[in-house]
A protein has these predicted regions:
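Conserved PLP-enzyme active-site core in the AAT-like
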Residues: 1-169
């Protein structure tokens, strides 16, 4: 798909589902930067243990907590991580440039204090105000249980995958 005047971000799965194709994040990042667009990377399959998308040019990283991070599929959740590197002051991003009447005419891309990235700050505050969006305590607890074993699970997954690769070689 081509980048055009309506494009507002580039989105890529680091490891695609279901074919498990691996994206060239550095190349996709170069395209995003050339067009002045944020790169959003879904790193669910790689987990932060195996891949750090910000080191490859990602601006925003998303994960399904239900799969690898939680480790057991019993709790629903997701996470969005903003690297704080993208400049949201381009006129294409009107939600961040124009005054937001519902927040005392705050311009998200300009008026936030240092250390408050515009994208994630707006993403956290607006749904929280409008919907009360937050993860349930039970789901949070179950996901934390899975996070405790993430390093061990990833090491075992990698060791098992290497054994399969040698066998199939």
């Amino acid at each position: 798909a081509a980048v055009n005047g309506r494009t507002r971000a580039l989105y890529v799965e680091a490891i695609g589902n279901p074919a498990l194709d691996v994206a060239d994040l550095d190349a996709v990042s170069a395209i995003a930067k050339r067009h002045g667009l944020p790169l959003v990377v879904d790193a669910t399959f790689a987990t932060p243990y195996l891949l750090r998308p910000f080191e490859h040019g990602a601006d925003i990283v998303v994960h399904s907590l239900t799969k690898w991070l939680g480790g057991h599929g019993t709790a629903l959740g997701g996470i969005v991580v903003d690297g704080g590197t993208f400049d949201w002051t381009d006129s294409r991003f009107s939600l961040y440039v124009e005054p937001d009447a519902s927040y005392h005419y705050l311009r998200w891309g300009y008026d936030l204090p240092e250390g408050y990235p515009p994208f994630i700050t707006r993403m956290r505050l607006v749904p929280l105000r409008n919907l009360g969006a937050c993860i349930s305590p039970d789901n949070a607890w179950m996901i934390l249980q899975g996070l405790e074993t993430l390093p061990l699970r990833m090491e075992r997954h990698c060791a098992n995958a290497l054994k399969v690769a040698y066998h199939l070689k």
